[in-house]
Amino acid sequence: MKLLVLAALLSVSAAAHIITPRALWQFRDMIKCAIPGSRPYSEYNNYGCFCGLGGSGTPVDELDRCCEIHDACYTQAKHLESCKSVIDNPYTNSYSFSCSGTNIICSSKNKECEEFICNCDRAAAICFSKAPYNENNKNINKKERC
């Protein structure tokens, strides 16, 4: 019985790991649409107090504030009934969007959770495109500055 439960947990975990990179790639692609030539993972991960995994404290600048707002948007999404399952949640759910120039369009065919997450990512990508990037806020000491 214990082996059956363990197998079920591992299969759910494996499914989440398969889906997660796709969801992250979509956000990355959205940022690349809004900011052509950008390198989202290397530029925005571990930037300020909120960009990257987790986040707390006070944003260090406008760009970091974009990440704080994005985190809050995902928190709101988790309260939607349609975003509460293992697969349909902000961190693993994929959605449909298109890019025309630097214009990001979330598909009208997205379901409720997908639409909400797509719009969270869209708003963040647009916010990133308008915020100045300060190299001094990359890989900061979060204990001291956040």
Swiss-Prot record:
How is its cofactor bound, per UniProt? Binds 1 Ca(2+) ion per subunit.
Query: What GO terms in the biological process aspect are recorded for it?
Result: antibacterial humoral response; antimicrobial humoral immune response mediated by antimicrobial peptide; arachidonate secretion; defense response to Gram-positive bacterium; fatty acid biosynthetic process; innate immune response in mucosa; lipid catabolic process; phosphatidylcholine metabolic process
Q: Which residues form the active site?
A: H70, D121
- One Pfam family name is Phospholip_A2_1
Q: Where does Ca(2+) bind?
A: F50, G52, G54, D71
List the propeptide region positions.
Answer: 16-22
Gene Ontology CC terms, in alphabetical order:
cell surface; extracellular space
- EC number(s) from the headed UniProt entry: 3.1.1.4
**GO function terms (MF aspect):** bile acid binding; calcium ion binding; calcium-dependent phospholipase A2 activity; phospholipid binding; signaling receptor binding
Q: What keywords are annotated for this sequence in UniProt?
A: Autocatalytic cleavage, Calcium, Disulfide bond, Hydrolase, Lipid metabolism, Metal-binding, Phospholipid metabolism, Secreted, Signal, Zymogen
User: Which residue positions does the secretion signal occupy?
Assistant: 1-15
Give the required cofactors. Answer: Ca(2+)
SMART domains given in the database record: PA2c
Q: How is it modified after translation?
A: Activated by trypsin cleavage in the duodenum. Can also be activated by thrombin or autocatalytically.
Q: What InterPro entries does this protein's entry cite?
A: PLipase_A2 (IPR001211), PLipase_A2_Asp_AS (IPR033112), PLipase_A2_dom (IPR016090), PLipase_A2_dom_sf (IPR036444), PLipase_A2_His_AS (IPR033113)
- Oligomer and partners: Monomer or homodimer.
Family to which the UniProt record says this protein belongs: Belongs to the phospholipase A2 family.
Q: What is this protein called?
A: Phospholipase A2
**Organism from which the protein derives:** Cavia porcellus (Guinea pig)
